[in-house]
């Protein structure tokens, strides 16, 4: 854990030098200690990192997760709880991963399902906290809690869903990047 804290502190220092506005980070796992204890541990670590980098404007974008194993972040509430526990929530934001949303049980395949997921983010964290998107299809079923990315249109979310996801006017100025697996047949 100390090495992770040290490493992230160094990454923030490098990002500061390069003018990078935020770093994307999976929140971590509770390792069998329960979600609440895991959130407290994560918030405490972030507080220490923020103290060590107090002059840096770099933010941490917590990424939602699929919920594999004891990973926290598969419920938006987990991310909101971290925001609520850190002493400098203004140093946080979120990165929303489409495959993780789907594997965690958020059915984003329809505009209604997408809107429901985004409404939860808005109510619990705030839409202005969405700093980026990781765009990818999912090789695994809805609510599988297994993190397996696929190429858009090749997975179970489906190509059609990305029409309403990438054209959501609320995020017209929010960056997104493809995070799909390497494949010899795609150039």
Model-derived features: positions:
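Histidine-acidic metal/acid-base catalytic patches
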Residues: 80-187
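Active-site acidic/histidine proton-transfer and metal-coordination neighborhood
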Residues: 1-93
């Amino acid at each position: 854990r100390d090495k992770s804290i040290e490493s992230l502190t160094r990454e923030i220092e490098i990002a500061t030098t390069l003018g990078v506005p935020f770093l994307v980070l999976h929140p971590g796992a509770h390792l069998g200690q329960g979600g609440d204890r895991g959130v407290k541990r994560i918030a405490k670590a972030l507080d220490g990192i923020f103290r060590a980098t107090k002059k840096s404007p770099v933010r941490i974008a917590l990424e939602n997760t699929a919920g594999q194993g004891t990973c926290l972040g598969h419920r938006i509430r987990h991310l909101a709880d971290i925001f609520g526990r850190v002493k400098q929530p203004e140093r946080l934001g979120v990165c929303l991963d489409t495959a993780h949303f789907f594997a965690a049980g958020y059915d984003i395949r329809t505009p209604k399902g997408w809107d429901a997921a985004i409404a939860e983010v808005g109510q619990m964290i705030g839409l202005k906290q969405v700093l980026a998107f990781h765009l990818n299809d999912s090789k695994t079923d809805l609510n599988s809690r297994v993190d397996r990315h696929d190429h858009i249109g090749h997975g179970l979310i489906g190509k059609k869903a990305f029409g309403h996801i990438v054209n959501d006017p609320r995020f017209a100025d929010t960056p997104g990047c493809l995070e799909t697996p390497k494949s010899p047949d795609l150039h």
